[in-house]
């Protein structure tokens, strides 16, 4: 299964360069090992997608709860995905 997510330019570039192999996401969607995460570069300054796309296979999943990235209400309801990619 393919799962599409937008990614900001700095994080997209790190992933493209192979310097970033994990991705932290609010766990409000279905995903499993073997799925393909389709990262679509999104520029928050322009409010639009750049057209660059990167596909990565999900190698490992760990669901955790963190309060540094999302509202406590959202974290309590969903948790987070820590997604390791190949």
Q: Residue ranges of each PLM-predicted region?
A:
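Short, charged beta-turn/beta-strand-edge "cap" motif at the junction between a beta-strand
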Residues: 28, 42-47
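Short, basic/aromatic beta-hairpin or loop at an interaction surface
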Residues: 1-21
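A structural micro-motif recognizing beta-strand termini
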Residues: 25-28, 86
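Short coil-to-beta-strand transition motifs
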Residues: 48-57
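Glycine- and charge-enriched low-complexity intrinsically disordered segments
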Residues: 54, 61-86
């Amino acid at each position: 299964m393919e799962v599409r997510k937008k990614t900001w330019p700095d994080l997209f570039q790190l992933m493209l360069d192979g310097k970033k192999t994990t991705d932290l996401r609010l766990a409000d969607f279905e995903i499993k090992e073997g799925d393909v995460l389709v990262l679509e570069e999104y520029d928050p300054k322009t409010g639009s997608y750049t057209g660059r796309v990167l596909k990565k296979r999900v190698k490992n999943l760990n669901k955790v709860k963190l309060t540094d990235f999302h509202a406590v209400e959202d974290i309590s309801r969903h948790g987070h995905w820590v997604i390791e990619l190949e």
